[in-house]
Each structure stands twice: as C-alpha cells, then as structure tokens.
C-alpha cells in the first residue's frame, strides 16, 4: 500500500479530540505514515483537548526532552461542590458539598496559585513510584506516599457560574491541572474536580497552528503540508 505522506520528518501540531488517548493518536499516525520513530512533547488525558506536539523522525524525536520542559498554557473548567477520586470528570464521585463559594472567596483563594507552589501528584497519574505508575496502585485501592514537587503557575479566573468555574493557567512542566482544581476546591471548603481542560499552548506552539486530530483517521490524509521545523516554520 502506498503511504499518504512522502515527507516523513518534522513536527506535526495536532488538536487532540476529546475522548481519545494520546497514545491512540500516536498509533494512528504511525500507521498512516509508516514511521515508527514518533515522539511527543507532552500527553493529554482522554477527556482533555488541545495542542499535542508530535515529533516525527530521529532528528526531531531526539529533542523531545527539551520540548517537554517548556511551559504550557491551558483553559480549564472546575466543577465546584463535588470531588472525585481521580480529581477529574472520569473519576468516581467520593464527596459532595452544598457550600456555594462567593466570587470574592474564589478570587482570594486563586491568589495562592501565583508563582512557585508545591504540588503532590494525584494517585491517578502516570508518575512512577517504586517502578510502578501511581494509577496502578490507585486501581487496587491503594494510596502511596508521594513526594512534593515545585512548579511555577499563573492562574486567572475568567468566569464563574456555580457550579462551573472557568480559569486560564500558565504553568511549568509537570503541573497537574487536576490537582489545581482539587486544591482550589479544598481551599474553598466545597471540593472540586476538573470538568474540562484544553491546552492552548505548548512552548512556542499554539492551538491556532494545529490540525484537527480526527484527520489522522483518514487513510489518504497527507500530513506533509503541515510539518514544521523547531521554530514553527513550515517545511
């Protein structure tokens, strides 16, 4: 079978569809272009959407660690008054509260999420402890002690209509936005989980440069017109 793409090295910017895993998109791309050397600059949870930076070919995948360390920007929605075990909409509900925070209380609590903060990775995450991913322990009902990590964040409240709290956030590598929503809910005394998440920027690559990830499902789709170099220029 003739492959749809002739140019097989470069950076492909994808707007990840909701409900798809990041690795399912990588597998689809591998099948589409016949190149096994494909990396990324950060995954997204299945419920999340937005910028995924795909690195195609050895020349580009070797710099994945550099791109992984770049800052990211998100638009997010927290659901107040309810908590889940995974801190997001895919988890099991473990608590509810009738408290309705005021906008002033929310603004005051949000000031904590400015600059350098300490964060503990959620149990439902791919962070490894003793050689196992945390979600492997969580699925067995186990809670493992996790080390705090230091991250840089800048959070801005953009809209509030209870129970939904919209915010934007710029953050450093390794920041769990689910944990931000969870911690904010705890500070407000009502609990919260992350309802929606959209990555708007990864390093210098933005959402308006991305193609719809669903296009990768088309067997004759040619990605070559959309491949970029490290500076974001078209190849």
Swiss-Prot record:
Keywords: Isomerase, tRNA processing. One of its GO terms (molecular function) is tRNA pseudouridine(55) synthase activity. Gene3D superfamilies: Pseudouridine synthase (3.30.2350.10). The active site is at 45 (nucleophile). Its EC number is 5.4.99.25. It catalyses: uridine(55) in tRNA = pseudouridine(55) in tRNA. Pfam families: TruB_C_2, TruB_N. GO terms for biological process: mRNA pseudouridine synthesis; tRNA pseudouridine synthesis. Belongs to the pseudouridine synthase TruB family. Type 1 subfamily. This is tRNA pseudouridine synthase B. The lineage of its organism: Bacteria, Pseudomonadati, Chlamydiota, Chlamydiia, Chlamydiales. The gene is truB.
């Amino acid at each position: 079978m003739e492959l749809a793409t002739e140019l097989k090295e470069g950076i492909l910017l994808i707007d990840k569809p909701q409900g798809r895993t990041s690795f399912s998109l990588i597998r689809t791309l591998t099948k589409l272009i016949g190149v096994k050397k494909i990396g990324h600059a950060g995954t997204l949870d299945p419920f999340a959407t937005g910028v995924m930076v795909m690195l195609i070919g050895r020349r580009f995948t070797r710099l994945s660690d550099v791109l992984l360390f770049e800052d990211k920007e998100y638009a997010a929605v927290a659901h107040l008054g309810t908590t889940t075990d995974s801190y997001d909409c895919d988890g099991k509900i473990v608590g509810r509260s009738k408290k309705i925070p005021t906008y002033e209380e929310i603004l005051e609590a949000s000031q904590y999420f400015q600059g350098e903060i300490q964060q503990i990775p959620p149990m439902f995450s791919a962070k490894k402890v003793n050689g196992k991913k945390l979600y492997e322990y969580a699925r067995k009902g186990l809670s493992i002690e996790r080390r705090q990590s230091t991250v840089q964040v800048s959070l801005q409240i953009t809209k509030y209509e209870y129970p939904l709290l919209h915010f934007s956030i710029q953050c450093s590598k390794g920041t769990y936005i689910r944990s931000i929503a969870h911690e904010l809910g705890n500070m407000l005394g009502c609990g919260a989980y992350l309802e929606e998440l959209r990555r708007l920027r990864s390093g210098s690559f933005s959402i308006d440069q991305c193609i719809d990830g669903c296009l990768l499902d088309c067997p004759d789709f040619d990605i070559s017109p959309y491949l970029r170099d490290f500076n974001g220029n078209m190849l």
